[in-house]
């Protein structure tokens, strides 16, 4: 029986480039060699596609940035990809240009099956404003928030500060609407810190989410499925910093993951059910990770959904499934099965 030709896309133009490389390194290592011919394709920060030989060199030698040995126009980049006649693609690309529906639409046009969310659900899961609107429509509990665009600054900061003071209070969080891995996020303790947080956030996006600060625990749940959806046991993040930012996620070894989380059975059941509900709210398919806040009074709030979560061997998504009874190589099998089923 011939092996399935599995393309693994990684790197990309987003600020989460290095995280993507680390995730892909785990995927190519753990995919079953007897079942798949793994063919990696790196994408540089400029959007150039790199062929398998160069990509293997990056993955096998601990290099965390994709660089092309020569400049390629878009036609050459696509040709590098198409020449390998892939059966399926795993886009291990986090953030804009990989997780937001653009790449998924490209693969749809090429009629190549791929793992994970569709164009629609990718876009909805990437844009926090759209995501939160969908959660509201489906009556999914979440933290209070406000959305601001750059044109809201035309009348100065006073109106924004007044609204935050009335509706959210201090401290609060400021987040770019279309970034992941907590890139560009600020914790704002007082009105005097708003200007700096806006400047930081608008560097990454044209609209920002202001979100109330929630005192409590950070819980995560992994989701898997198409029409029939299941959720893993939940895990807990114990950040070594004031909040779980990019440094805490990927560079600070003080952060601890508790898998599975120590929770009452009723909270576990509620987290799993809410994770599935959030997944269905964005019309999800394949896989996703859903993040929660567990308030000190026991109320569970959905924070966000990630349609291409971190996928290193040590990332929460695969570790939660391992704790639930599905190991990493079998998880890859299941994702491929779901992707082909969805065609």
Curated annotation (Swiss-Prot):
It is found in: Cytoplasm. Its EC number is 6.3.2.4. The keyword DNA-binding does not apply. GO terms for cellular component: cytosol. Mg(2+) 2 binds at residues 304, 306. Pathway: Cell wall biogenesis; peptidoglycan biosynthesis. Residues 132-337 form the ATP-grasp domain. Its cofactor is Mg(2+); Mn(2+). Binds 2 magnesium or manganese ions per subunit. Its main location: cytoplasm. Keywords: ATP-binding, Cell shape, Cell wall biogenesis/degradation, Cytoplasm, Ligase, Magnesium, Manganese, Metal-binding, Nucleotide-binding, Peptidoglycan synthesis. One of its GO terms (biological process) is cell wall organization. Belongs to the D-alanine--D-alanine ligase family. Cell wall formation. This is D-alanine--D-alanine ligase. It comes from Halothermothrix orenii (strain H 168 / OCM 544 / DSM 9562). The lineage of its organism: Bacteria, Bacillati, Bacillota, Clostridia, Halanaerobiales.
């Amino acid at each position: 029986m011939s092996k399935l030709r599995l393309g693994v896309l990684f790197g990309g133009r987003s600020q989460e480039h290095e995280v993507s490389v680390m995730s892909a390194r785990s995927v190519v290592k753990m995919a079953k060699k007897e079942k798949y011919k793994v063919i990696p394709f790196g994408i540089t920060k400029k959007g150039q596609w790199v062929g398998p030989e160069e990509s293997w060199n990056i993955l096998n030698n601990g290099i965390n940035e994709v660089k092309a040995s020569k400049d390629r126009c878009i036609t050459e980049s696509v040709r590098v990809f198409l020449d390998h006649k892939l059966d399926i693609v795993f886009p291990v690309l986090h953030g804009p240009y990989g997780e937001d529906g653009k790449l998924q639409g490209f693969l749809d046009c090429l009629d190549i099956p791929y793992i994970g969310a569709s164009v629609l659900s990718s876009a909805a899961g990437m844009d926090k404003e759209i995501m939160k609107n969908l959660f509201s429509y489906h009556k999914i509990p979440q933290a209070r928030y406000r959305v601001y665009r750059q044109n809201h600054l035309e009348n100065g900061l006073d109106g924004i500060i007044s609204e935050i003071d009335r509706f959210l209070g201090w401290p609060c969080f400021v987040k770019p609407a279309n970034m992941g891995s907590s890139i560009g996020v600020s914790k704002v303790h007082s009105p005097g810190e708003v200007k700096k947080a806006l400047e930081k956030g608008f560097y990454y996006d044209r609209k920002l989410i202001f979100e109330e600060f929630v005192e409590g625990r950070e819980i995560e749940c992994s989701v898997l499925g198409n029409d029939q959806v299941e959720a893993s046991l939940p895990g807990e993040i114990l950040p070594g910093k004031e909040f779980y930012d990019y440094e805490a996620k990927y560079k600070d070894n003080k952060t601890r993951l508790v898998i599975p989380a120590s929770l009452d059975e009723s909270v576990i059941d509620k987290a799993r059910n809410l994770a599935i509900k959030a997944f269905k709210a964005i019309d999800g398919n394949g896989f996703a990770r859903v993040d929660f806040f567990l308030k000190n009074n026991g109320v569970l709030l959905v924070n966000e959904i990630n349609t291409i979560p971190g996928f290193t061997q040590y990332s929460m998504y695969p570790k939660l499934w391992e704790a639930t009874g599905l190991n990493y190589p079998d998880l890859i099998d299941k994702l491929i099965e779901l992707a082909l089923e969805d065609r």
